[in-house]
Amino acid sequence: MRGGLNDVPNLHLLGVTHPDAVVFPQHDLEIYGRALCGYDDMVPLHASRRRTTRWQIAMAHGHYVPPDDWAAESHRSWRISDAALSACQADYVALGHWDRAAQVGDGAVPAYYSGSPHLAGTVNVIRLNRRSGVMVAREPLTASAAR
Protein backbone atom coordinates (compact mmCIF):
# COMPACT_ATOMS: atom_id res chain seq x y z
CA MET A 1 0.00 0.00 0.00
CA ARG A 2 1.43 3.35 -1.13
CA GLY A 3 5.10 3.00 -0.38
CA GLY A 4 4.69 0.82 2.68
CA LEU A 5 2.73 3.36 4.71
CA ASN A 6 0.55 0.57 6.12
CA ASP A 7 3.68 -0.89 7.71
CA VAL A 8 4.49 2.23 9.75
CA PRO A 9 3.28 1.73 13.34
CA ASN A 10 0.80 4.30 14.67
CA LEU A 11 0.52 6.13 11.33
CA HIS A 12 -3.09 6.80 10.37
CA LEU A 13 -3.85 8.52 7.04
CA LEU A 14 -7.48 8.85 6.02
CA GLY A 15 -7.86 7.74 2.43
CA VAL A 16 -4.54 5.86 2.54
CA THR A 17 -4.23 3.57 5.58
CA HIS A 18 -7.93 3.88 6.50
CA PRO A 19 -10.84 4.59 4.13
CA ASP A 20 -12.56 7.30 6.17
CA ALA A 21 -12.24 6.79 9.93
CA VAL A 22 -9.89 5.70 12.69
CA VAL A 23 -11.18 4.52 16.07
CA PHE A 24 -9.04 4.77 19.18
CA PRO A 25 -10.92 2.52 21.65
CA GLN A 26 -8.61 3.37 24.55
CA HIS A 27 -9.77 7.01 24.26
CA ASP A 28 -13.37 6.25 23.24
CA LEU A 29 -12.60 8.42 20.18
CA GLU A 30 -13.30 8.28 16.46
CA ILE A 31 -11.63 10.61 13.97
CA TYR A 32 -13.26 10.70 10.57
CA GLY A 33 -13.06 12.53 7.27
CA ARG A 34 -12.73 12.02 3.55
CA ALA A 35 -9.63 12.33 1.46
CA LEU A 36 -10.11 14.69 -1.47
CA CYS A 37 -8.87 12.62 -4.37
CA GLY A 38 -10.29 14.53 -7.32
CA TYR A 39 -12.61 17.23 -8.54
CA ASP A 40 -15.73 15.13 -8.96
CA ASP A 41 -16.91 15.82 -5.39
CA MET A 42 -16.37 19.35 -4.12
CA VAL A 43 -18.05 18.82 -0.72
CA PRO A 44 -15.33 18.25 1.89
CA LEU A 45 -17.59 17.86 4.93
CA HIS A 46 -20.56 15.53 4.74
CA ALA A 47 -23.32 14.92 7.27
CA SER A 48 -22.76 13.16 10.55
CA ARG A 49 -21.63 9.58 11.02
CA ARG A 50 -23.39 7.20 13.35
CA ARG A 51 -21.59 7.47 16.67
CA THR A 52 -19.82 4.43 18.02
CA THR A 53 -17.63 6.32 20.52
CA ARG A 54 -18.10 9.01 23.17
CA TRP A 55 -15.93 11.49 21.27
CA GLN A 56 -16.00 12.23 17.57
CA ILE A 57 -13.64 14.52 15.67
CA ALA A 58 -14.31 15.38 12.04
CA MET A 59 -11.51 16.41 9.68
CA ALA A 60 -12.01 18.34 6.47
CA HIS A 61 -9.84 20.17 3.96
CA GLY A 62 -11.52 23.19 2.47
CA HIS A 63 -12.34 26.87 2.64
CA TYR A 64 -14.77 28.09 5.33
CA VAL A 65 -17.18 30.68 3.93
CA PRO A 66 -19.48 32.65 6.27
CA PRO A 67 -23.17 32.89 5.28
CA ASP A 68 -22.96 36.52 4.14
CA ASP A 69 -20.12 35.70 1.73
CA TRP A 70 -21.46 32.40 0.33
CA ALA A 71 -22.72 33.79 -3.02
CA ALA A 72 -19.66 36.00 -3.56
CA GLU A 73 -17.29 33.10 -2.87
CA SER A 74 -18.88 30.68 -5.36
CA HIS A 75 -15.61 30.54 -7.33
CA ARG A 76 -13.87 28.74 -4.47
CA SER A 77 -13.60 24.98 -4.45
CA TRP A 78 -14.26 22.79 -1.42
CA ARG A 79 -16.37 25.35 0.45
CA ILE A 80 -17.44 24.67 4.03
CA SER A 81 -20.54 26.37 5.45
CA ASP A 82 -21.93 26.87 8.96
CA ALA A 83 -24.68 24.41 8.01
CA ALA A 84 -22.10 21.76 7.07
CA LEU A 85 -20.21 22.29 10.34
CA SER A 86 -23.42 21.92 12.37
CA ALA A 87 -24.66 18.92 10.37
CA CYS A 88 -21.55 16.86 11.07
CA GLN A 89 -22.48 16.85 14.79
CA ALA A 90 -18.89 16.13 15.79
CA ASP A 91 -17.46 17.29 19.10
CA TYR A 92 -14.72 19.13 17.21
CA VAL A 93 -13.93 19.85 13.55
CA ALA A 94 -10.26 20.03 12.53
CA LEU A 95 -9.93 22.03 9.32
CA GLY A 96 -7.08 22.35 6.89
CA HIS A 97 -6.40 24.68 3.97
CA TRP A 98 -5.63 28.05 5.55
CA ASP A 99 -2.07 29.06 6.46
CA ARG A 100 -3.19 30.93 9.58
CA ALA A 101 -4.84 29.56 12.68
CA ALA A 102 -8.48 30.57 13.11
CA GLN A 103 -11.69 29.59 14.82
CA VAL A 104 -14.56 29.58 12.31
CA GLY A 105 -18.26 28.93 12.16
CA ASP A 106 -21.21 30.02 14.21
CA GLY A 107 -20.04 28.15 17.31
CA ALA A 108 -22.55 25.29 17.13
CA VAL A 109 -19.57 22.93 16.75
CA PRO A 110 -16.00 23.98 17.67
CA ALA A 111 -14.23 24.31 14.31
CA TYR A 112 -10.63 25.43 13.92
CA TYR A 113 -7.89 25.74 11.34
CA SER A 114 -4.50 24.95 12.87
CA GLY A 115 -2.68 27.06 10.31
CA SER A 116 0.93 26.22 9.53
CA PRO A 117 2.61 24.96 12.71
CA HIS A 118 6.04 25.34 11.12
CA LEU A 119 5.51 29.02 10.26
CA ALA A 120 3.53 30.03 13.36
CA GLY A 121 5.48 27.89 15.81
CA THR A 122 2.19 26.83 17.43
CA VAL A 123 -0.34 24.01 17.29
CA ASN A 124 -3.92 23.56 18.43
CA VAL A 125 -4.11 21.31 21.48
CA ILE A 126 -7.56 19.76 21.87
CA ARG A 127 -8.66 18.43 25.24
CA LEU A 128 -11.80 16.31 25.47
CA ASN A 129 -13.19 16.14 28.99
CA ARG A 130 -16.45 14.51 30.07
CA ARG A 131 -17.16 17.30 32.59
CA SER A 132 -15.91 20.41 30.83
CA GLY A 133 -16.37 19.34 27.20
CA VAL A 134 -14.03 20.41 24.41
CA MET A 135 -11.20 22.83 25.17
CA VAL A 136 -8.96 24.25 22.45
CA ALA A 137 -5.69 26.05 23.17
CA ARG A 138 -2.91 27.35 20.95
CA GLU A 139 0.35 26.02 22.33
CA PRO A 140 3.90 26.87 21.25
CA LEU A 141 6.07 24.22 19.67
CA THR A 142 9.33 23.64 21.45
CA ALA A 143 12.52 24.02 19.46
CA SER A 144 13.02 20.25 19.35
CA ALA A 145 9.42 19.58 18.27
CA ALA A 146 9.62 22.14 15.45
CA ARG A 147 12.51 20.31 13.73
What are these regions (language model features)?
Residues L119-R147:
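Acidic, His/Gly-rich catalytic cores of divalent-metal-dependent hydrolytic chemistry
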Residues M1-Y112, S116-G121, R127:
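His/Asp/Glu-rich metal-coordinating catalytic cores
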